[in-house]
Amino acid sequence: MRRFALGRPFVSGARRLSRGGLIDRSRSIRFRFNGKTYTGHPGDTLASALLAQGVRLFGRSFKYHRPRGIVGAGAEEPNALVQVGEAGYSTPNLRATQVELYEGLSAQTVNGWPSLKHDVGAINSMFSRILPAGFYYKTFMWPRSAWMRYEHFIRKAAGLGRTPEFPDPDIYDKRHIHCDVLIVGAGPSGLIAALTAARSGARVILADEQAQFGGSLLSASSTIGGTRAVDWVKKIVDELRTFPEVKLLNRSTVVGYFDHNFLTINSRRTHHLASGDSDPRMSRERLWRVRAGEVVLATGAIERPLVFDGNDLPGVMLSSAVTTYIRRYGVAPGRTGVVFTNNDSGYQAAIDMAWAGMKVVAIVDSRRFPGASVARETEALGIPVYKGHVISSARSGSEGLNRVELS
């Protein structure tokens, strides 16, 4: 068994890079998180802005209230649920990785009492042996009339957002629309599909949940035909905008796919704006009801986490998320790190970490024979590679993740 000490904790050493990313460093945005004021930049999400300032604790687990940090960089994020806004503008259970930063944004975590750092609910872990899965459905059954009182405290302890207590001042609308081709996802495949259909004269709708089109290319360091990936995306999108029969829907999630190519799309039209900055006549959200001749699903993929003891600790992140924070948001999520992988993408994450000035202690590859090209690149950077090994456990101290063990 090998042990690696990470030195200064992984996430507490996070910092903003002086180069790279798609953020506007010339402007600063002030916002509040859990009552404390922070600053970020246009192009940041709430998660990236907080990571850049060393925030590592974003929530508590559902049952034992174990500390939780950022794992992903988008819709796959399971931990960083926040309540955004106040009074009638309050919205619960949004992912910090999807909340775009704007001036005056106010957010707070949805659990942890009296505070996120000092959560009384963490005492539950001491009684884990007598709190099996679903214990509350078997334990609090008598007297039956008391269940509603039990439920109030059980749900509060679980920790989800609060339903707004004031009327919603915003407006919402819906639209019906027909198209020849609906493309779901605006990554490289979706963009090419949209451009090909548009050039044929078809009526096209391109929908993507992110603020910017490009998908994985927004955090890619590669080139396409000698052009930087982000510049290639801009070129394609600019051409798409010249077609009158093409509708581009960013910040829009396809939420339903029904018979006969009937789909529904939820467009978040003003979520990225402060309440006083949006046109009061403009709807906050719009539901598109689409009848499509053909549907192209170009939704990409989500990385699956590897399993080991302690993989839920703050500081354990998906390699794709690390790359995204470095390349798209200009944030190094730590000073040191270990990469655990079973495919070549982990090596690219290690290369990105080294580019960001992080010390990559090791790459742990469960395969005995990794891809030759990525192996050569990491060897040139002097990064040790442990082939045919796995991480068996991760441990943390008072300030964050500080040690991993291999087997």
Features from the language model and the residues they span:
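Residues forming the flavin
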Residues: 2-407
